Amino acid sequence: MTTPLAVIADLVPPGSRVLDLGCGDGRLLAHLRDTRGCTGLGVEIDADKLIAAVQKGVDVLQLDLEQGLSMFADDSFDVVLQIDTLPNIRHTENALRETARVGRLGILSFANFAHWSIRLRLLTGRLPVTPELPYEWYNTPNLRIATYADFTRLAAHCGLRVVQAFGLRGGRRIDFAAGLLGSEAVFCVQRA
């Protein structure tokens, strides 16, 4: 388990029912099951990642998140995770509202485009390539970029309350000036 994922896993209450949107290879759900006694369901569109998750004993549905989460009732889960998923979704507001509808707590993370090193790279006239944003501008899977401050505004716009927010840098939690010093942003949100 990578350190950033371990920090995020610590935010999930033991024994929670967890939905992981864009679960990838199922590593986080398997960790939550094995160390925190959580039950979980992953959603993944990529067939190879889905197979890797199933091989870890994780239950996974192959769904396109752009279609919404209408198959789940309100409050079906204690926690809904979107780890590095939101920048890859076209209908961001709907995805965020659906996260809050089907779960009591939403935990989201994404690369923070306002990190100081990215700001510095932009001064050279080029888009950055970093561990958190490892692609050139022309081949990135990200549909959009986000900042810590922008997400705070989006959450309010969607009628959500931010209950906890911080940055991550090198697996370390950053609480002071998280928008400037955190290369990744982490938010816990609930319906207001």
Task: Describe every region a protein language model picked out.
Residues 1-15:
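Conserved alpha-helix/loop element of class I SAM-dependent methyltransferases that forms part
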Residues 22-24:
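Class I SAM-dependent methyltransferase "Motif I" SAM/SAH-binding loop
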Residues 31-68:
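Class I SAM-dependent methyltransferase SAM/SAH-binding core
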